[in-house]
Amino acid sequence: MSGGFELQPQDGGPRVALAPGETVIGRGPLLGLHRNPCYYQSSEKSQLLPLKTNIWCWLNPGDHFSLLVDKYIFCVLSTHSEMEMECTLRNSQMLDEDDILNEIPKSSSADLPDKTPSAPRRERSTETAKPQAAANNMSFIGESRDLSKQQPNPSERKRILPAWMLTENSSDQNLSVISGGNNVTWESEKERVCKDKTQVNITQPGKKRLISSGSSESTSAKQDTGKKCKNDDQEESIISSKEMPQSFSAAMLHNTEIDNTKTNPQRSKVPVEALGKVSEHKIITKGSSNEDSTARSCSESYSSTQSKSFCDKPQKSHPEPSSNPPSPECVQAKATDSVPNGSEENKVQRTSCMYGANCYRKNPVHFQHFSHPGDSDYGGVNITCQDEADDRPECPYGASCYRKNPQHKIEYRHSTFPVRSISDEDDNVGQPNEYNLNDSFIDDEEEEYEPTDEDSDWEPEKEDLEKEDMEGLLKEAKKFMKRKK
């Protein structure tokens, strides 16, 4: 048999791969048992036929052979046929996917004209919203038709974006929209100049998100609500981490909400807030630091004018503020200047390290608690200083403590014990002694035993005897003098 074939045991078990070349049944892993003949069973016949020795027999995929009559039965399988089956299955699945992709844009283009007329029905309360909604509907239908024409071939298998994502991209390309209430125009970076209090030019890199009045926001809210609601939390966290004056965002959101509540109060809150947050995020991410400073100055002047206009509308009696609020950069600089002063006042004086310049420790915690040569507070507090108001316990060894651990010296006081003078040892001061001079026990304690190397037969000379007598007399005299005291 040639390579590319496997044997499947009918009794169960893993397949046996055949080596390329000729394979002899009854040798190697297919060794016969007790010299019994091997049996052959074709796919058409149902009986096992014994094979004759030294005679070739062709085995086709699907045939069976066994080493015993009822055991060790193997089925011949072709790996090439299995690969062809897998390829055919994959091709059929690819064709099914292509058919599904062809049906998707047709249904989307058919649904768009039915959904879009619902926007002008809900916005009949305002007359200005009707032409804008009709224009948006026409643009949606035109884009869907372009999509159906520009569909790629099934063989290319390119990803097709849904209609609401494409409409969002088209709305981003309108760069000259001007809102009626705020007079905010979006221009290129070269033309960014703060003109008047009520007119601000703000530049954004790349795509630019515009806030328009009336129904243009409410109509685009249908397609954009799903995506913007998901990204609301992420945008809030990004905006909060940036340094952007909050008055600008509050003024923009408040003004846009006033314009939108007239047309569609229930459905335009989410897109307006999302648009405001996206515009803030894009304003923050500017190219250079100079552009950041100019954009922030523009936003501050705009916020001051907006606050004036909003205060004048509901309450005309309020006077206008005399000066603009201070810039966040100035406030931040003041805060940073005041922080080091407070930190210097609250700084605790560290303890001087006992090793000084020879300290070998590298632990930063050690440097936080101990000062070293070169520090401003080095030498101010010593570990060995003993104050009267020191609450630490006294070390039992005092100044003669042998421990070298700095932590031990911090936790315990090591004061020197007062040395007793000769006058303190005098017994005349205080109460008199009540010793019994005739007590034999006291005399026995005071007598000292002096070991000698003298033998019992040794007799001392006269000079030695005189020295011993003198020493004994001196001891007795000292004892007598002590007793008198």
Curated annotation (Swiss-Prot):
Q: Where in the cell is it found?
A: Nucleus; Chromosome; Cytoplasm, Cytosol
Entry's Gene Ontology BP terms: DNA damage response; DNA repair-dependent chromatin remodeling; double-strand break repair; double-strand break repair via nonhomologous end joining; embryo implantation; regulation of epithelial to mesenchymal transition; single strand break repair
Flexible linker: where is this region? 380-390
**Which residues lie in Acidic residues bias regions?**
441-469
List UniProt keywords, sorted A-Z. Answer: ADP-ribosylation, Chromosome, Coiled coil, Cytoplasm, DNA damage, DNA repair, Hydrolase, Metal-binding, Nucleotide-binding, Nucleus, Phosphoprotein, Repeat, Zinc, Zinc-finger
Modified-residue entries (Phosphoserine), positions: 92, 125
GO terms for molecular function, please?
3'-5' exonuclease activity; ADP-D-ribose modification-dependent protein binding; DNA endonuclease activity; DNA-(apurinic or apyrimidinic site) endonuclease activity; histone binding; histone chaperone activity; nucleotide binding; poly-ADP-D-ribose binding
Q: How is it modified after translation?
A: Poly-ADP-ribosylated. In addition to binding non covalently poly-ADP-ribose via its PBZ-type zinc fingers, the protein is also covalently poly-ADP-ribosylated by PARP1. Phosphorylated in an ATM-dependent manner upon double-strand DNA break.
Question: Where is the major localization of this protein?
Answer: nucleus
Biased amino acid composition, Polar residues: 212-223, 237-249, 286-309
Pinpoint motif NAP1L motif by residue range.
449-473
Locate the motif KBM.
157-166
Q: Where are the zinc fingers (PBZ-type)?
A: 351-372, 393-414
Q: How does it assemble?
A: Interacts with LIG4. Interacts with PARP1. Interacts with XRCC4. Interacts (via KBM motif) with XRCC5 and XRCC6; promoting recruitment to DNA damage sites. Interacts with XRCC1. Interacts (via C-terminal disordered region) with histones; interacts with histone H2A, H2B and H3-H4.
Question: Which family is it part of?
Answer: Belongs to the APLF family.
Description of its domains: The PBZ-type zinc fingers (also named CYR) mediate non-covalent poly-ADP-ribose-binding. Specifically recognizes branched poly-ADP-ribose chains generated by PARP2. Poly-ADP-ribose-binding is dependent on the presence of zinc and promotes its recruitment to DNA damage sites. The KBM (Ku-binding motif) mediates interaction with XRCC5/Ku80 and XRCC6/Ku70 and recruitment to DNA damage sites.
What name appears for this protein in its UniProt entry? Aprataxin and PNK-like factor
